Amino acid sequence: MSETYRHFFVKALYDMRESVILGMDQRRKPQEKEGTKQMKFDMHCHTKEGSMDGKVPIDDFIAELIRKGFNGMLVTDHNSYNGYRTWKRNIKDQKFKDFVVLKGIEYDTIDAGHILVIMPETIKLKILELRGLPVQILIDIVHKNGGILGPAHPC
């Protein structure tokens, strides 16, 4: 994961935490640096292709997010990359070219509930599609492979 994306996700996870603690109306206004663009992202998305609780196909999900002013999404299906794979194989170069879709997963640990995991695109770890690791082992695996993680449902 490039340092730009790593910084983006760490900041996004912090902002999510801050939103929960302070409430959306009390959040600080984000500061943009020269040459950068603020993007509106949905950081926790389940798709019909990848999660049992996902009701909307990923292409319909993207269209709805665009309609609501979003620039991107993090696909975080439960213990599966299938929603992201569907986008990458069937949609990526055909439509929604300016919309950013990133790969994540909502991992079900045995002792700490659901954890969002974001790995570098080049890392392929099948173990993340199996559920039930203890959270400390998950943290070690993710960090050793250059990923980041955080609580899926912080409150």
Kindly give the residue locations of the regions a language model identified.
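A metal-dependent hydrolase metal-coordination microenvironment
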Residues: 17, 27, 32-140, 144
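Aromatic (phenylalanine/tyrosine) cluster motif
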Residues: 5-9, 14
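Short loop->beta-strand "edge-of-pocket" segments that line small-molecule binding or catalytic clefts
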Residues: 147
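Active-site-proximal loop/helix segments of hydrolase catalytic cores
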Residues: 150-155
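N-terminal amphipathic/hydrophobic targeting modules at extreme N-termini
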Residues: 1-2
